[in-house]
Amino acid sequence: MEKCYTDVTEFAIPASTQKLYLSPVLDGFNSEIIAYNLSTSPNLEQVKSMLEQAFTEKHYENTILHSDQGWQYRHDSYHRFLESKGIQASMSRKGNSPDNGMMESFFGILKSEMFYGFEKSFQSLKQLEQAIIDYIDYYNNKRIKVKLKGLIPVQYRT
């Protein structure tokens, strides 16, 4: 891994008063989602859990992790964790979402392919959560990408 991207996105469905928040890490090399966390609250624990899942291997030294300027990514404990792993933090310019275009693009694909137009079909947050888990598996292991020469993200890495 050389450059990875992260952010948090929100899902709301009519069947629930609560929302679901997805916090993934996307590998810039092959667009694979290498870790993610789903939570009903966009809190620091969600981001910490996602980071611990993403950066347990030895392949992260000299990695740059890019995010927007969300409060989670400005927190001291976030920066301490990255420093402890030898990961360099990078942040978008304030109010400039194109700086985090790879992550925003993934969110757009995810929501257009499995969420927008289907919101009413999810009867619970658990059902939505499972649909997101299934989609990320599909995205990493079955969905071909033209920019990866017609391969899926997992194949392209090997």
Question: Which functions belong to the PLM regions below?
Answer:
Residues 67-69, 75-76, 89-111, 126-129, ...:
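RNase H-like two-metal-ion nuclease catalytic core shared by retroviral integrases
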Residues 1, 22, 43, 47, ...:
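Hydrophobic (often cysteine-bearing) scaffold residues that line and stabilize catalytic clefts
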Residues 18, 36-58:
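Active-site beta-loop-alpha junctions of metal-dependent nucleic acid enzymes
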Residues 52, 80, 104-108, 112, ...:
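Generic alpha-helical structural context detector
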Residues 27-28:
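Short, acidic, Ser/Thr-enriched surface-loop or helix-capping motifs
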Residues 83-87, 111-158:
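C-terminal domain-tail junction helix/linker
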Residues 1-24, 48-49, 60-62:
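Mobile-element integrase/transposase regions
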